[in-house]
């Protein structure tokens, strides 16, 4: 429950610091939950801490390697860390997946121009 509330706050840039605290609490209770781990990594990304974001998102993608949202978050982070070839590889894997969870046109644009155009 903490994860969903905190993630929704992050997406609206509302109480970001509190959201990070909530996610850390949730993560400490369930360190093997890919969605909590992803949300915590995404919180660090939204806060501009791309190195810390990469640690959590890398772990999240290991826990749930074919999840398109986790993959997209990880690729966005890799791009910010100037690891553009790796980022494009992960975005391409979303394009090639059978998932319809994300807009593949948006992902194709990221492959060309990066996440900042969106």
Question: Language model features by range: what are they?
Answer:
Residues 4, 39, 73, 107-110:
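Canonical tetratricopeptide repeat
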Residues 80-118:
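Terminal, low-structured helical/coil segments at or just beyond the last alpha-helical repeat
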Residues 7-8, 42, 76:
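Residue-level recognition of tetratricopeptide repeat
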Residues 34-35, 68-69, 101-102:
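Helix-start (N-cap) detector for alpha-helical repeat units in TPR-like alpha-solenoids
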């Amino acid at each position: 429950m903490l994860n969903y509330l905190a993630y929704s706050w992050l997406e609206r840039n509302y109480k970001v610091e509190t959201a990070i605290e909530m996610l850390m609490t949730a993560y400490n209770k369930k360190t093997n939950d890919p969605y909590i781990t992803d949300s915590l990594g995404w919180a660090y990304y939204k806060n501009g801490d791309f190195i810390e974001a990469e640690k959590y998102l890398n772990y999240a993608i290991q826990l749930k390697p074919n999840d398109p949202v986790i993959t997209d978050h990880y690729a966005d982070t890799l791009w910010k860390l100037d690891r553009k070839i790796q980022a494009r590889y992960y975005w391409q894997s979303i394009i090639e997946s059978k998932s319809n969870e994300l807009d593949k046109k948006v992902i194709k644009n990221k492959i060309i121009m990066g996440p900042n155009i969106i």
